[in-house]
Amino acid sequence: MPISKTLSKAAKAEKEKFTIPKSVQDAIPIQRIWPDGIFQVGRRFSKTFSFTDINYSIASKDDKTAMFLDYAELLNALDSGASAKITINNRKVNKAEFEKSLLLPMKEDGLDPYRKEYNEMLLSTVTGVSSSVVQDRYITITVAKRNIDEARTYFSRVGTDLITHLAQLSSIGRELDIASRLQIFRDFFKGNEPAAFAFDLKEHMQKGHSFKDWLCPDSMEFHKDHFRLNDRWGRVLYLQDYASYIKDSMIAELCDMDRSLMLSIDILTVPTDEAVREIQNKLLGVETNAANWQRKQNAANNFSAVLPYDMEQQRKETKELLDDLTNRDQRMMFGLVTMVHLADSKEQLDSDTETILTTARKHLCQMSVLRWQQKDGLDTVLPYGLRRISALRTLTTESTAVLIPFRAQEILQTGGIYYGQNAVSKNMIVVDRRKLLNGNSFRLGVSGSGKSFSAKEEIVSIALSTNDDILILDPESEFGFLVEALGGEVIRVSASSDTHLNAMDMDKAYGDERNPLIEKSEFILSLFEQLVGAGNVSAKEKSILDRCTYDVYREYMINNYQGEAPTLKDLYHTLLKQPEPEARGLALSSELFITGSLNTFAQRTNVDTKARIIAYDIRELGEQLMPIGMLVTLDAIFNRVIQNWKKGKTTWVFADEFYLLFRYAYSADFFYKLWKRIRKYNGLVTGLTQNVEELLRSDTARLMLANSEFLILLNQSATDRDELAGLLHISENQLSYITNVAAGCGLIRCAGNIVPFENSFPRNTRLYQLMTTKPDEVLRGA
C-alpha cells in the first residue's frame, strides 16, 4: 500500500547495521561533520535550526488561533522527502558563566557594598523556581542525499523557507554552525561543566583528534529502564497512547520542570496523493464491510437492523479524515513524541518520572518508559536527526500542531540589565537597551505601582556596572538620596537656592558639529523668547541679541574657552550699551531674571556639572521660573550628551513626571527632537509618568511612545489601559497583567514583544531603602 511504501522507504533509509559500541565515542551516532553544521548520520544528512519562543500561553483566543494556524502552515510546508524533529531542550544554567555575564565585579570605588547587595539579589533570583533552566528550541531536518553538495543545496532551500515561516510566527530562526550544534550535545552529556576551550574543527583536524572527544561523557551505562552518564541518571520515555482530544498546553506542561531534559516530536509527512489513495481504499473497505453486514441482515429478514456503532463510527471517522485531506488543506503525518530527563540520583529520577507520567495522565495520555531500548530512545530524542523507535502515530496537520512547542517568550540578552522575572516561566529578564534599534523607554503606571523604584533599580545597575553617565530630571525630589549615595551631584534649581547654573556656560565641545557660538546664540534667542513671550522677539531684536552675544563671548573665545564664562548679567550690560532703543527694551524685559529676584541663572555656576551622575532637582522652580529653568536645564543635559558622544561615552537620561514637560512648548519640542536624535549620540532617554491619559493628549507624546522599543507598563487605571491597549496592540489576556497587580509587576514591551514580568527587591538592604519612596522605609543617607 502507498503509506506502507512511505514508511518502508523511511525505514530503509534509517536502517543501519548494528555494532556493539566499544567506547563512549562509538555510542555517539554521528559519522561525519562539516563546518556549516551538517551531520552525516547513517546514510543520511541532518541540519539543525534554532528558533525562539513566542508568547503563546498569554495570547488572546483570536491570537492563539492565528498562531496555531501559522504553525500548522509551517508543518504543511515540511517536505515529504525528509523527516523533521522538533526539540525542546531544558538546559541548566552554568553558575560560573552566569556569574561572569551578569554579576557585578568589584571596583574598590567605595560602592562595593552596594554591588554585593545587588549580586546577592541576582543570585537569589537565579536559584529560584525555574531560573536555573534555560529552554532552547530546535528543528532538525534529515534527508537522504547522494553527497554533501546535494545535501547542502537542499538545506539551503529548506532553511530559507523554514526561517520565513517561523518569522510569520514572530519567532526568530537561525542555522546552527558546527560549534553551536555540538555544544547542544556537550551540554547534555557533560552537564553544565564549562569547556576548557571552544570547539575548533580546524584545530581538531590538524591534531588528529575526534570531535567526539570534546562532547562525549566519561562513561555511559544503559540498563533496562534507565541509563547513566558519568554520575548522573537518565531515562527515556515515549508517548504511547494519545487522547481523542489533547490540549495545546500539554507539551509546555511536560517541559515545565526545573530539570535537564529534552522532548522531541518526530514528524514524517506523507505525500497527499498517497494519503488520499490510502484513505479512499480504507473507506471502500469500510463500505464493503457495511454492505456485507446489511446483506446478511436482509437475508435473515432483519430489514430494520441498524449498523453497529463501531462500524458506523469507523465510516464516519474515515470520511472525516478524507474530507480533511481533500477539502481542509490537511496533510497526513506520522508522529512520535519522545522525552529524556536527567537527575542527580535514582530516587530523584524515579520521582521526576512519576511527575511526567502524572502530567500525561492529566491530559488523558499515557507516557511509557522504554524497556531495553534506552540507547535507541536516547539516539531518537537527541537532535542528531535519527529515529530508532517505531511507535509512530498517524496524525493530521491539526492534530500534530496541537503538540505546539511554544509557551512564553524569553528576553535574555548578554551584557544587559536585569529587569525582573518572566511571570509565566519565572526566568530572568535581561535586556541590553543599547542593542535595540531605538533604546528609548517609557515607564508608565499609577502612583504606587513601582515605576520610580524600577527606574532607580536601572540607575543602580548602570552606575555599578558601567562607566556611563546618568542625568536625571527630577521634578519631585525623588532621586536625590540615591544619587548622593552613588557619589553623584544633586543640583537643586530654584529662585531661593544657593545652587546656581550659569545659563551662558559654554566650552569647546558645546553643541553639535557646528561653531559653538552659533549654537549658543540660538539658545540665547530661545531663552529671550521665554523671557519676553514666544513670538514677541522681532527680527531687529534678534539681530541685536546675536551681535551682543558675540561681543560678550569674544574675549572668552580668544582665551580658548579658558577662565570664567560670561553670565546673563554681562549680556544685560552689553544690551544697555547698544544705541538702539530695542536693546534697552530687551534689557528691561529680562531684568526680573537677570538682576531681579529670579536671577539664579544669571550667576556663575557653583556646583559640579561634570559629575558622572547628576540629578537636576527642579521641584522648587515655581511657575514664573519654570520655562527659563527648564530651558537652561535641558540645554545642560543635551550638551552633556554631546560632550560624552565626542568622548565615546554613553549617556542615560531619565525624566520623571514626563507629562509635565508637555505643558511647555519648548520642553515638549526638545524631548521630541532628543527622542529622535539621541541614539546618534550614544544616548538613551527614559520617561516616567503616572498621568498616561494627560500625556497621550499630545500627538507628539503618542508618537514617541509608539516608537519606543522598550516600555515598562505597571499597574494602570481603567482609562489608561484602554488607551494603551489601542496604541500598543495589547490583548485582553495581556491587560490582566497591568490590572490591579502588585507594585513591581506588569508588562515589558521589548522590540515589539510583550512579556509579563514581576520584580521584587529584598527589603532588608541599604539599596532598597535608597530606592523606595515609602516614607517609613526611605534611607536619608548612606
PLM region spans:
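Extended, folded cores of ATP/NTP-driven motor/assembly subunits in large transport
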Residues: 1-406
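P-loop NTPase motor domains
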Residues: 54, 61-80, 87-91, 255, ...
